[in-house]
Amino acid sequence: ERNVVGGDKELCTDFVCFFEACFPKIPSVMVSSDESEAIKYFSNVFLAYKVAYFNKIYDFCHATGMDYNNVRKGVTGDSRIGKSHTQVPGIDNDRGFGGTCFPKDLNSLITQFEERNINCDMLKEVWLYNEEIRTVIDWPVT
C-alpha cells in the first residue's frame, strides 16, 4: 500500500524514483533509516494489537453466548477498522499472533520504551495476553 524508503536522502531519491516509475499508484515515503525502522515496528505492533483486541472480542462473545462472526462482521464493516487481522482463530488455526515479526517487533518496542523510561504497560499487557492464549510458540525464544 506504500513504499517506505529509509536512509541517506541522496541514495533514497533514486529508489523512490524507481518505485514511483514501477508502481505509480503506490505512494512512497522517504524518511531517515531510524524513521523507517520505527515505521516497521509501529505498523507491525499495531497489527499485533489488532489481533489481540479481536481475540478479546472473541473471549467476550464466547463468555456471553454471542456469535463472534456476527459481531466481527458488524465491527469490521466500519471502513476505519477493516477486516484484516480479525479472524479468530487466525490463519494458522491458533489464537493470538506468532511468527517471526509481530513477537519480535513487540518485544523490541518494549525494550526501547523501557530504555527511554517510557511507560509501556499497554505493550506488555498485549504480550502477556498473547502468551496466555497462544498454544504454539513459533517465534525464537531468547
Walk through the language-model features, giving the residues of each:
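Internal alpha-helical scaffold of NAD(P)-dependent oxidoreductase catalytic cores
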Residues: 1-84, 112-119, 129
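C-terminal substrate-binding/catalytic lobe of Rossmann-fold NAD(P)-dependent oxidoreductases
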Residues: 68-124, 135-139
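A short beta-alpha structural unit
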Residues: 128-134
